[in-house]
Amino acid sequence: MSPLKIQGPIRIRSMQTGITKWKEGSFEIVEKENKVSLVVHYNTGGIPRIFQLSHNIKNVVLRPSGAKQSRLMLTLQDNSFLSIDKVPSKDAEEMRLFLDAVHQNRLNAVAMKPSQGSGSFGAILGSRTSQKETHRQLSYSDNQVSSKRGSLETKDDIPFRKVLGNPGRASIKTAAGSGITATRTIPSLTSTSTPLRSGLLENRTEKRKRMLSSGSELNEDYPKENDSSSNNKAMTDPSRKYLTSSREKQLSLKQSEENRTSGLLPLQSSSFYGSRAASKDYSPSSTNLDRTNISSQTPSAKRSLGFLPQPAPLSVKKLRCNQDYTGWNKPRLPLSSHQQQLQGFSNLGNTCYMNAILQSLFSLQSFANDLLKQGIPWKKIPLNALISRRFAHLLVKKDICNSETKKDLLKKVKNAISATAERFSGYMQNDAHEFLSQCLDQLKEDMEKLNKTWKTEPVPGEENSPDVTATRVYTCPVITNLEFEVQHSIICKACGEIIPKREQFNDLSIDLPRRKKPLPPRSIQDSLDLFFRAEELEYSCEKCGGKCALVRHKFNRLPRILILHLKRYSFNVALSLNNKIGQQVIIPRYLTLSSHCTENTKPPFNLGWSAQMAISRPLKASQMVNSCITSPSTPSKNFTFKSKSSLALSLDSDSEDELKRSVALSQRLCEISSSEQQQEDLEKDSKSCKLEPDKSELENSGFDAMSEEELLAAVLEISKREASPSPSHEDDDKPTSSPDTGFAEDDIQEMPENPDPMETEKPKTITEPDPASFTEITKDCDENKENKTPEGSQGEVDWLQQYDMEREREEQELQQALAQSLQEQEAWEQKEDDDLKRATELSLQEFNNSFLDSLGSDEDSGNEDVLDMEYTEAEAEELKRNAETGNLPHSYRLISVVSHIGSTSSSGHYISDVYDIKKQAWFTYNDLEVSKIQEASVQSDRDRSGYIFFYMHKEIFDELLETEKNSQALSMEVGKTTRQAS
């Protein structure tokens, strides 16, 4: 017997995935819509992979693998290679026979599931030619049968009966002397009836002939149908089954040829499967109703289709619509594929803290839009940057890729963070809040490097604008969505002197309020208000010498999303342990910041805001969305100079040494030169630039608005580009005169991409001096008496030769370092796999130990100085109403909660609950598992385990929700219009 499912280690090689590692799983054969497929399941879970076998098998090889075990290797037409190892030899041999039969197009002669109660190979499939000709007339009945196949695969004891012969029509006859009767299974009408194996129904032509038989023959055969013992006994021998199926196949082909010549009557739109109206409902209740109605009819009524008249044109038209609807013929997806968008992240080994934080961050729609929809040049970002092919790549593919690809992307994100924060490099449990802080800081740093390093295309419409720089500034999603500013006002109690101090935050760490037994549990709103309460501190006033001051905290700028970290851990000095406080804290739907804002508090950035919109007006450092350093007093885009320090940071290691030398020499020259001498240099250089009108026009366009210091920088820039190496005071700056080492941002952009032109263009600059510039610069050099003529030129050439040698040596060292790095990487990966196995076992053990303590201690926080906020009765009532409605100004709505289940920070488990704006529903992400949850359950179930809370500004939330609703309504309208047009 051919097994339909075998298990063992699996490895797949394909063009899409390459060669995978050996993983435990199973091969399962599935046939649907007359097509055979191989479904690969992995024991670790995930979406099954499906490979079509019909007309797609290239080769099947079976090799021994150990005692009584074999390895089955299957090659498909596209050279995809599938292997399953350590399979029992008997099962592997039977699977090979089945695959060979499929390969040789003998599918209809092979049994699909004898081990699951099918009991016979007797189901006969008609030829493909016959099916194509009769498809338009039989599509309605076929759709009804196929719709029930999926639920009729696991029942046992199928009764059989003989094929009814009809003398008036070409009946099916067995070979002479065979003694084997062609059998068929009765079509079932309900999920509880006798099952059918998908794809093994008999030829529709034979079915129609049996429907034309007389009622007496039908009644005579019913006892034989229900008597399955004789049939099962006759079909227990596999060889007899195979022989029977082969002969039935030949008879089926012969009969189909006869039907082609004789012709068939068209099938009426209503059949013995049930009425058209009833067939549209596939629920169990409606199916049972169909069975009742049909069973009440007489047998002759069921089999009377052959005597019906030709179908009406209306019926034919409706049948054609059913046929044209391709959804009936599409293979049904497995149940797991319907939840593809609801699949979480795999646990790499104690990485639940990372999964929970990433799910919460990715659920922030405005954050995701700012990261993905502003055209960031990902190819120009270093590969080890978090936002390049790491964070953004995972965000894009988290809902569309398979679990293995997603796992690889997760590893890359973890490695990118571990490269900066080594504590996350292993597989030990880490704190989710620490990971969140590191992730946000690293994203911010990477975006700053991007804006400092790369100059992008000019903004459309601003190429000719004289007052706006054409350099595009990319918006940092952390700053626009999560960062906010708090102003601390230190007020002297003696003289009233106020000293303001501003500070930026990505989140707030708030204390648990001390719980008073008689009072009800406190809420997140109470903890937030406690954080912003006024405090007294010792402070020495410079004005009056007072020693006491009062500190008040107010929001200076609000965020789109407010992240609150509830400090649930207390350190036990005696035991040196971090204990978790399981104090109950109410989680309100809405928070309000109105009492912590002033008239000057700035609202969050609106959804249409970007850094490019604000680039024309100067902002303070605390207000800059990105720290892209430009000169505010040089509006001309031709003279947008960066500071030397920031320039050095933005270049790669190959040009760093050269840049340091050039910067040092330039600074020395600036210190020696006086303002009068620089003015003379400007006039002389302007004359020399007249030989190149186009370039001089561009450069002089920005002189009017420049200060004296900036004119100096411009002169140095022009002299480095125009002058040749000559006996002048500018020889010291000559190593940076090639376009690749200039201060212009265009040159900076190309430096890391291709550093070689730096070497090839320098000799060209040396061999092609400008005579006019040479004369004037020589005269100017004699006046300043800074350098000597011959020594400077010779020293320049020697320096270039030395530089070339250093570059050669650095290249060799780089190659050696790369080779060593590859070896270390292989060793590290091996160690990582071992650590992963140990960490997984440790994680499961710690989770089981801490599960009983998941609620944590119910004692209060122990914060003696944090008792309770004193509200008036009216304020308390107003806050209570706002917690449900959010009517107060500056209200924020709950959109995500990260919870910790366990008693200590070094063990336990993290999960996240997020609100999906697109689906307008709450979901719980527990590593790979995703489940739907009600918001009320989130508020009640996480009141003792909630650790990090994400609140979105109510106006931003309402705007996103309204946009999503309009988008969905528009999509439905477009879909409706398309269906009507078709």
From Swiss-Prot:
One GO biological process term: regulation of protein stability
Q: Where is this motif: KEN box 1?
A: 32-34
Q: How does it get modified after it is made?
A: Polyubiquitinated via 'Lys-11'-linked ubiquitin by the APC(CDH1) complex during late mitosis, leading to its degradation. Able to mediate auto-deubiquitination. Phosphorylated at Ser-631 by CDK2 during G1/S phase but not during mitosis; phosphorylation at Ser-631 is required for deubiquitinase activity. Also polyubiquitinated during early G1 phase, without leading to degradation. Phosphorylated at Ser-115 by ATM following DNA damage, which in turn increases its deubiquitination activity towards BLM.
The segments labelled Disordered in the record are: 128-162, 183-307, 672-705, 720-798
Return the motif ranges for D-box 2. Answer: 96-105
Q: Where is the USP domain?
A: 343-954
Q: What does this protein do?
A: Deubiquitinase that plays a role in different processes including cell cycle regulation, DNA replication or DNA damage response. Antagonizes the anaphase-promoting complex (APC/C) during G1/S transition by mediating deubiquitination of cyclin-A (CCNA1 and CCNA2), thereby promoting S phase entry. Specifically mediates deubiquitination of 'Lys-11'-linked polyubiquitin chains, a specific ubiquitin-linkage type mediated by the APC/C complex.
Question: What is the recorded name of this protein?
Answer: Ubiquitin carboxyl-terminal hydrolase 37
Q: Which organism is it from?
A: Sus scrofa
Query: What phylogenetic lineage does the species belong to?
Result: Eukaryota, Metazoa, Chordata, Craniata, Vertebrata
